[in-house]
Structure formats: structure tokens, C-alpha cells
């Protein structure tokens, strides 16, 4: 599918380059502020406008409030109609800075009486591009750097469902609105502020600002097919580190382990309902687990009354690598590093459990071309489809690849289908403009980053950076076409499936698993018990549902 171009965003780089001479180098590396100090706009000796008062004598315990207030000041002061060069009047010293040794030395040399000034934003009554003007408040700047400020405030998880504390979104979303509306001055201003606050080792807000800034500059850049520099993803890592990091993530977060647990229990439930225990079990794996899901399933299968089936076939549909270098078309969490092979280890483990396992991989096989022949299914086996976090990559407009694929699955006559997906609104260009879609992507990534803040206590963890870098693909992937659980259920019914009630083992197992994790995670079971949802801080993250063939389709 080819995405519809956005005439405004397609040409935005042209007018950015024509207006600001240093934007090309800034877009190439938004975190290298070496370029910035070469330009007069960043002269720290500029006179401070009378509308500001400065107070730099604040300790790091107020870092979170400091940043929030700076956001309020910067969004407020940028809501008025700006002249072409009006951003030159915004002093660099008003922004929280990434200090180096020189900066710290210069601060120490400042006269003591200059540390007691106070910075306030003037009150504004108008908003621009749909962004509500924020009431100006006292801006308190941390005496330390962002990293220290973040440590002083812990993981900032208390801001998970508090819009006022989620300051990164208050910068990213208005910037996307400004890009959509073609407001050059506002884009400039917000990109500068984001550049100063972005950090991959800060709290969830700082990390969201970092990934969001990369995504926005990536959107503005002409080289949109390349992966933004500095991001660690699955494909950029070494296979052993990749597998180790996945296992660690499953241990610390239920983001994937919870739906996998429900799916495994559902497969056993479907298998137990089959009258013939001597049939081959064939699992069609369309997921993102990279093999991590199956060891616990094989163990449970070996303990099953009557023993495991005589043969277990696992057909893994790997994500197509034809777009491996095009982040705009790559489903998050779907493509591992080159050389990653979990088959040998899984086969050895199955042998130790006396489970006769066969693994077949379908590489470079798009879901749109999947059929019974390519899967090699037969009527004398028990086929169960496990589709997790991959089907939202299929187009749901014209052509409606999503509904067609579900009908293909129906034609294979599986005994059960487990569907797990993100529980959120669509972000594609057909369901809204760039600003609308971007705000939904940011919301998704915030929940991921906020939850990993609680899971990974080490801010410099490479494992956490890899998982978050992979999740951040959602900000740039043009095929992130999610839908709410209700819409997915409607599609499944239209394709000829009927919802199946989860058994007690699946429900109780899911609840028991969540007790291992942060208490902000919760599980919600729908009234008819055919769908289970995973929530983080009272907000939906994903759902898992169980389906069988509707014997009497309407």
C-alpha cells in the first residue's frame, strides 16, 4: 500500500531550509548542539526581555515542576502570531540546557546576585493551531543537568495518567499541529525546546521528547526511508544480546508476556476440546515473540493429561524483510537481527521434554499472499492460528487487506484463532491528518516508556534502550493502522468467526502472572469472557481474544 502524500508536510523541509540556514545539519543530528552555538540566535549574551524574570537558585528536587513550567512558558510565549525573525528574541538562556563542563564553569563564575532573578511567562489569552494557551507559571531551573533531575524524581510514574505531568506531549503534539498547519515559527520554537529537553537516559518525559524529536525531524527530512540515527532497534543488535534482552523484558514487563500467556492457555484449551488426541497439532505463528513464547507452552504441553500430541508443527510467518531498511514500513517488534535463529534451541528443549516438534519458517512471505498451500495445512491435523501484534500492519481501507486476510484464515478452517492486538485508534493518513495520527502514536509510546520506567530501574540499560527504540518505530511507521478491540471483534464476526469464552486456566493464569509485575498493570475481562484486556494506569494497552469457526454465519 502506498500512503497518500501530505502536500504540506512534503514541502515543509523546503521552507524550513529557506528560512533557517542551519536546519539541514540540525535535522541530520538533532542532539548535536555543536552546530547551534555557531549561530547568532544561540548567543547566550543576548539581553533578557522584560517579560521574563529568572530564578536559577533552585535545587534538583524541583526538576519535574521546573520542566513542566518551562513547557508552559514556551508554549504560551509561542502562541502569539510571530514575525519571521521573532524567535531571535527568545533568549537561549530561557531554555533548560544540556550542560557541559564549560557551562558548569561559567555558571560558577556568575555573580551571586544574578542567581536570584525569577523567570515568569507573561499571561496569554490566545492559542495557535488548536493548542490551548497555557497559563504562565514560575519557571524554576534545576541546578543540575537533566539526568540528575530525572533521578531526583524517580521514574516519574505518578505522572502516567496525569496530563499535566506529561509535558513532552505538550510540546510534541503542538509541533505536529504546527507542521500540519505550515506554521514555520512555531515549528522552529518547539523543535528548539524539544532539542534542549530530549534525553534517552532521563525519565519517561525526557525519553518521549527524544524519540518524538527524532520522529518529527525524520518526518521533515527528505531521507525519510532511512532509520533515524542513534536509535537502537532489534535489527541493529547482535543476536545473542537480542535474545537476552527479550527474555529480560519478558521478566520485567507483561507487555508481551501477558498476551503470550493467555494465548498459550487458549491453545491448550482448544486442544483439550478436540475429541482425537492422536492428531497432529499445527500452530500457525504470526507474531512478534521471536520464539520466546514457546518454551513455556512446550513445558505445559508435556505435562498435559495423556501427554503431548504425536507431532507438533510450528509454522512461523516471519515479517517480510523486503522493507527492513525502511522504518516507515516496518511493524514494531517484528524483525529481529540478521543471524537470529531460535529454532535449534527450541528443538533441543522440546526433545528434552519428549515433545516431537517440527519448525518451519516462512521468510519474506507477506501476509497478503498467505494461504493454505503456503502454510501446508491438512484436514487430518488440528490447526490453531496465533496472530499477535502483526495484523494491524494490513491496510483497512482500499483495498481492505485486513478483512480479506481474516477470510483467508477462515478458509483454512482452524480449530481456534487467538488474536492479540494494540487497543488503540488508527494512526494512518486515511483516519486523520498528520497531527491527529502523531498524537495517537505519542500516546501509545508514552504508555510503553512509562511502564518500562517502572520495569527497568537502570536508566542506562542497553536492554531498555533497545526495546524502547523498537517501540518508537510506531512514531514513524506509516502502516501503524491500529483499531479498537470492538472493531477487531466486528471484523472477526464478519469473516465468519464466533467469540469463544476463555477457560478458567487462561483467566486465572493471566491474573497470577500480573502479580509478578508493577501494580499499575491490570487485567480486564469482558462481560462475555471472550476477550481479555491489558491496562496500564487505567488506560488500555492491548487485548487478547479467542475465536472459533461460526457454524451458522449470518
Swiss-Prot record:
Residues 95-107 have a biased composition (Basic and acidic residues). The keyword DNA damage does not apply. Expressed in epidermal and cortical root cells. Residues 159-548 form the GRAS domain. GO terms for biological process: nodulation; regulation of DNA-templated transcription; response to symbiotic fungus. Residues 166-227 are annotated as: Leucine repeat I (LRI). Its main location: nucleus. Residues 383-468 are annotated as: PFYRE. Residues 471-548 are annotated as: SAW. Induction: Not induced after treatment with Sinorhizobium meliloti. Keywords: Nodulation, Nucleus, Transcription, Transcription regulation. Residues 76-165 are annotated as: Disordered. Residues 331-373 are annotated as: Leucine repeat II (LRII). Residues 150-162 have a biased composition (Low complexity). A motif (VHIID) lies at residues 281-285. Residues 246-315 are annotated as: VHIID. It is found in: Nucleus. GO terms for cellular component: nucleus. Residues 82-91 have a biased composition (Polar residues). GO terms for molecular function: DNA-binding transcription factor activity; sequence-specific DNA binding. It holds the Pfam family GRAS. Transcriptional regulator essential for Nod-factor-induced gene expression. Acts downstream of calcium spiking. May be a target of DMI3, a calcium/calmodulin-dependent protein kinase (CCaMK). Is essential for Nod factor-elicited expression of ERN1. Transcription factor involved in the control of strigolactone biosynthesis in roots through the activation of the beta-carotene isomerase D27, which participates in a pathway leading to biosynthesis of strigolactones. Belongs to the GRAS family. This is Protein NODULATION SIGNALING PATHWAY 1. It comes from Medicago truncatula. The lineage of its organism: Eukaryota, Viridiplantae, Streptophyta, Embryophyta, Tracheophyta.
Amino acid at each position: 500500500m502506498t500512503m497518500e502524500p501530505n502536500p504540506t508536510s512534503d514541502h515543509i523541509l523546503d521552507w524550513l531550509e529557506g528560512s533557517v540556514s542551519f536546519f539541514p545539519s540540525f535535522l541530520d543530528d538533532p542532539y548535536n548542539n555543536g552546530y547551534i552555538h555557531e549561530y547568532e540566535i544561540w548567543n547566550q549574551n543576548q539581553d533578557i526581555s522584560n517579560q521574563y524574570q529568572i530564578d536559577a537558585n533552585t535545587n534538583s528536587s524541583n526538576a519535574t515542576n521546573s520542566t513542566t513550567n518551562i513547557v508552559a512558558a514556551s508554549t504560551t510565549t509561542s502562541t502569539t502570531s510571530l514575525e519571521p525573525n521573532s524567535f531571535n528574541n527568545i533568549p537561549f538562556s530561557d531554555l533548560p540546557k544540556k550542560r557541559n563542563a564549560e557551562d558548569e564553569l561559567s555558571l560558577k563564575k556568575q555573580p551571586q546576585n544574578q542567581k536570584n532573578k525569577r523567570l515568569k511567562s507573561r499571561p496569554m489569552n490566545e492559542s495557535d493551531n488548536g493548542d490551548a494557551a497555557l497559563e504562565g507559571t514560575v519557571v524554576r531551573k534545576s541546578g543540575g543537568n537533566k539526568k540528575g533531575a530525572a533521578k531526583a524524581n524517580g521514574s516519574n510514574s505518578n505522572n502516567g495518567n496525569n496530563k499535566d505531568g506529561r509535558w513532552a506531549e505538550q510540546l510534541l503534539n503542538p509541533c505536529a499541529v504546527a507542521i500540519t498547519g505550515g506554521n514555520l515559527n512555531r515549528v522552529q520554537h518547539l523543535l528548539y525546546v524539544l532539542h534542549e529537553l530530549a534525553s534517552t537516559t532521563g525519565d519517561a518525559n525526557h525519553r518521549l521528547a527524544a524519540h518524538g524529536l527524532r520522529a518529527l525531524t525524520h518526518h521533515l527530512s527528505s531521507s525519510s526511508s532511512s532509520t533515524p540515527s542513534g536509535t537502537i532497534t532489534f535489527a541493529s543488535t547482535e543476536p545473542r544480546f537480542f535474545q537476552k534482552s527479550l527474555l529480560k523484558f519478558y521478566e520485567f514487563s507483561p507487555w508481551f508476556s501477558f498476551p503470550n500467556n493467555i494465548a498459550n492457555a487458549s491453545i491448550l484449551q482448544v486442544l483439550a476440546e478436540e475429541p482425537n488426541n492422536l492428531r497432529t497439532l499445527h500452530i500457525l505463528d504470526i507474531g512478534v515473540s521471536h520464539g520466546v513464547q514457546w518454551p513455556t507452552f512446550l513445558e505445559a504441553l508435556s505435562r498435559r493429561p495423556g501427554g503431548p500430541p504425536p507431532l507438533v508443527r510450528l509454522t512461523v510467518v516471519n515479517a517480510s524483510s523486503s522493507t527492513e531498511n525502511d522504518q516507515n514500513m516496518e511493524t514494531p517488534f517484528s524483525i529481529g537481527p540478521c543471524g537470529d535463529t531460535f529454532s535449534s534451541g527450541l528443538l533441543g528443549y522440546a526433545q528434552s521434554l519428549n515433545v516431537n516438534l517440527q519448525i518451519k519458517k516462512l521468510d519474506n512471505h507477506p501476509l497478503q499472499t498467505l494461504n493454505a498451500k503456503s502454510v501446508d495445512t491438512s484436514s487430518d491435523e488440528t490447526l490453531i492460528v496465533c496472530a499477535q501484534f502483526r495484523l494491524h500492519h494490513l491496510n483497512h481501507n482500499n483495498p481492505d487487506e485486513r478483512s480479506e486476510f481474516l477470510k483467508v484464515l477462515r478458509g483454512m478452517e482452524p480449530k481456534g484463532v487467538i488474536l492479540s492486538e494494540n487497543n488503540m485508534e488508527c494512526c494512518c493518513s486515511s483516519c486523520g491528518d498528520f497531527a491527529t495520527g502523531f498524537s495517537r502514536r505519542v500516546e501509545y509510546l508514552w504508555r510503553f516508556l512509562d511502564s518500562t520506567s517502572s520495569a527497568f530501574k537502570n536508566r542506562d540499560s542497553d536492554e531498555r534502550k533497545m526495546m524502547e527504540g523498537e517501540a518508537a518505530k510506531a512514531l514513524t511507521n506509516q502502516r501503524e493502522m491500529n483499531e479498537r478491540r470492538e472493531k477487531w471483534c466486528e471484523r472477526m464476526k464478519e469473516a465468519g468467526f464466533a467469540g469463544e469464552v476463555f477457560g478458567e486456566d487462561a483467566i486465572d493464569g493471566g491474573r497470577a502472572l500480573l502479580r509478578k509485575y508493577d501494580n499499575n498493570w491490570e487485567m480486564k475481562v469482558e462481560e462475555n469472557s471472550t476477550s481479555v484486556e491489558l491496562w496500564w494506569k487505567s488506560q488500555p494497552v492491548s487485548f487478547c481474544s479467542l475465536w472459533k469457526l461460526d457454524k451458522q454465519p449470518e
